[in-house]
Amino acid sequence: MPFHLSRRSFLASTAGFIALHPFSARAQAGQAHLRLMETTDLHVHVYPYDYYADQQIDTVGLARTAALIEDVRAESTNALLLDNGDFLQGNPMGDYIAYERGMPEGALHPVIEAMNTLGFDASTLGNHEFNYGLPFLMNSVAGADFPIISANVVKSM
């Protein structure tokens, strides 16, 4: 005879299991806490500014995020700050850097400079990192003080 469990019963059972399971208890002596912070799709939003509307906004930007990162680091000594990619392209500032100013060797991209300042521990490359071409990408990430992690992109020497 088949056993049928309603969605509500399943969710209630799962919630009960999680609440009673030992991993939900506070850490015991000898255990460590790790706090993970992650950003994604920054799209060159270093400043709290909407370049399309030409006005300051308070919903985007690493400048705004910096205060949150500082708060978390004050709470936790074991905190990692990671980025999930798509940080070099996505707004007029990114286009200006890529098409007008360029990324000469030795120059530091504003997003990379901000990420270095905030102490990012690692980042991956998103699909938009490749939009401006490999020379721009390689020059942009060359100044990163953190590793760029990728399992499916290979740089030929």
Label the model's feature ranges.
Residues P2-L5, S9-A12, F17, P22-M157:
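Acidic, metal/ion-coordinating pockets
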